[in-house]
């Protein structure tokens, strides 16, 4: 390249670096930065000149030099460790062999900084440093925003040890570039621990390019409890139900939790209780849990003459691990091993049947918040469950055998999928869409079937209206917030399913569809009181359970948290 162009560029870059040096004395790299930070400016700006006088002034040497161009042959990066250099080279490859100016070099630096941002290095900056360009080779310097000191301040009443906080933050290594993805994950894993409230701040440290992290861990209420009243039951099992829940956060001061839940239905026709415990294992977000539950029922209504009663005992072990843990995107891997022991009696005729269902489930739970179409929230859940039904009494096992029985005895597999989307439409209007699916490998026991009716399905029908082996449920809601406390919504529900995966040769068509529509209201007020109400009319045939048809059908729930 001509020596005059080379010298002019050197002058331009040098003058730019001098301005940056005045702005941030002590910085190791001088020049034009690109990144989340703004470009360096002189500490003291000169007084503004009169416009007429300015027109007569000659063009400053730096401006003239900045317009000098040369053919770019290569770009070299210094200070790179957080991202592959090949990606940086790919970002600037389109400029190689072209004539460039200082302004073009600043664009190259901005492109390189964008690569860092995509990798989560929000504090990284890319500079055009002071240099003399030889043979078209330009050097870009990177300040990656390395982590300096990590300071942890623990409130005296915080139910957590300093070691657990420090080990959870260990993914953030001092001396290495501060990655925003790792930073979010570490802080969210801390916030997932019950009983504490972590806060953090990043500040510029003393060493060049280093950033110090300060983490403050406060305490939350250790005991949380709530009450819920609803009409989700049926006429035969007790329509109105009262549920109480209690959580003891971090009882062993390790981020664990102990939970108790009890429910009693109207007339004590149904009673349920569950105790569970969950604890973190290691410091990467893995949690292991276990629970014991018991349910008892006594059916009334038309079944009363037979005096039907039942008992179910359930034990389970579970785990959860966050594959992705970010503010906008989360992906959890979850698994469960459970054992159900069920006894049903018809005391009036002296008949008892006993069953055991045990199995293993593995699933994924995904959620994401985005700005598409004005903003929205998406969730996806999938689980594959492999289980086995053992019918313990000979009489029931005999009548389960084909061709007169449905052959539920033995191993089975079922897949369940759920998807939902909440989408912004207008300042006071949003759309919610939800769908659920179940597919089975064979005929299932009633305890493993999918219910097409109820408050979480087609709301114009009772819980247990249609129990299916294979089926789907879909809903759409148009939501309109009346104020900060109340939201009115209109909905339409639909479902379809086959009561048995494989019907008997002489069975009629056992598939059924349900439709319903209606209005609902969600209301909450300060003091942790929440009320949910839905009123639904059926769009298909009359209901066959819960005493027949109810039109409209009303579901409501009142919750109070303490």
Pin down the residues of each PLM region.
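C-terminal transmembrane beta-barrel domains of outer membrane proteins
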Residues: 400-562
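Residue-level signature of outer-membrane beta-barrel architecture
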Residues: 217, 248-250, 279-281, 321-323, ...
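Transmembrane beta-barrel strands of outer-membrane/channel proteins
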Residues: 202, 227-231, 260-264, 290-294, ...
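Strand-connecting loop/turn motifs
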Residues: 121, 195, 220-222, 253-255, ...
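Transmembrane beta-strand segments of outer-membrane beta-barrel domains in Gram-negative
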Residues: 280, 285-438, 442
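Residues that define the transmembrane beta-barrel architecture of outer-membrane proteins
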Residues: 209, 238-242, 269-273, 311-315, ...
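Outer-membrane beta-barrel translocator/receptor signature
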Residues: 208-211, 222-229, 235-260, 264-277, ...
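Periplasmic polypeptide-binding modules associated with outer-membrane biogenesis and secretion
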Residues: 2-4, 24-233, 245, 263-271, ...
């Amino acid at each position: 390249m001509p020596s005059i162009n080379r010298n002019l560029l050197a002058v331009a870059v040098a003058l730019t670096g001098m301005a940056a040096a005045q702005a941030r004395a002590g910085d190791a790299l001088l020049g034009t930065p690109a990144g989340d930070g703004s470009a360096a400016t002189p500490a003291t700006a000169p007084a503004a000149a009169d416009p007429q006088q300015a027109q007569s002034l000659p063009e400053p040497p730096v401006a003239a030099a900045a317009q000098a161009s040369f053919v770019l042959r290569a770009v070299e990066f210094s200070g790179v460790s957080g991202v592959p250099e090949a990606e940086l080279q790919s970002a600037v490859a389109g400029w190689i062999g072209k004539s460039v100016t200082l302004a073009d070099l600043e664009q190259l630096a901005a492109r390189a900084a964008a690569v860092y941002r995509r990798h989560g290095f929000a504090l990284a900056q890319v500079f055009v440093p002071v240099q003399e360009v030889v043979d078209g080779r330009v050097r870009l310097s990177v300040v990656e925003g390395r982590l300096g000191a990590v300071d942890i301040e623990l409130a005296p009443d915080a139910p957590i040890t300093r070691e657990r906080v420090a080990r959870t933050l260990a993914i953030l290594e001092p001396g290495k570039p501060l990655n925003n993805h790792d930073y979010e994950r570490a802080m969210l894993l801390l916030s997932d621990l019950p009983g504490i409230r972590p806060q953090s701040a990043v500040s510029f440290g003393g060493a060049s390019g280093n950033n110090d992290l300060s983490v403050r861990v406060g305490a939350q209420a250790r005991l949380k409890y709530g009450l819920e009243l609803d009409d989700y039951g049926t006429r035969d099992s007790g329509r109105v139900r009262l549920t109480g829940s209690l959580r003891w956060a971090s009882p062993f001061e390790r981020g664990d939790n102990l939970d108790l839940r009890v429910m009693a239905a109207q007339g004590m026709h149904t009673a349920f209780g569950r105790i569970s415990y969950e604890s973190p294992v290691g410091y990467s977000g893995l949690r292991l849990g276990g629970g014991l539950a018991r349910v008892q029922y006594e059916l009334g209504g038309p079944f009363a003459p037979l005096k039907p009663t039942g008992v179910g005992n359930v034990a389970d072990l579970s785990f959860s691990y966050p594959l992705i843990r970010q503010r906008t995107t989360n992906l959890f891997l979850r698994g469960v091993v459970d054992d159900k022991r069920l006894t049903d009696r018809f005391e009036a005729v002296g008949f008892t049947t006993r069953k055991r269902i045990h199995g293993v489930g593995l699933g994924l739970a995904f959620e994401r918040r985005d700005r598409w179409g004005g903003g929205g929230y998406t969730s996806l859940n999938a689980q594959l469950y492999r289980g086995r039904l053992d019918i313990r009494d000979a009489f029931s096992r005999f009548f389960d055998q084909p061709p007169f029985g449905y052959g539920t005895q033995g191993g089975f597999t079922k897949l369940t999928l759920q998807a939902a989307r909440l989408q912004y439409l207008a300042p006071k209007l949003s759309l919610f869409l939800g769908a659920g699916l179940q597919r089975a490998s064979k005929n299932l026991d009633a305890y493993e079937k999918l219910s097409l009716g109820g408050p979480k399905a087609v709301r114009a029908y009772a819980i247990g209206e249609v129990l299916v082996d294979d089926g789907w449920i879909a809903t759409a809601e148009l939501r309109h917030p009346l104020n900060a406390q109340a939201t009115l919504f209109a909905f339409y529900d639909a479902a379809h399913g086959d009561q048995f995966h494989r019907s008997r040769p002489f069975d009629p068509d056992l598939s059924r569809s349900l439709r319903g529509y209606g209005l609902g209201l969600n209301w909450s007020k300060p003091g942790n009181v929440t009320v949910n109400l839905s009123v639904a009319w059926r769009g298909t045939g009359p209901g066959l359970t819960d005493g027949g048809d109810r039109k409209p059908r009303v579901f409501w729930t009142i919750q109070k948290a303490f």
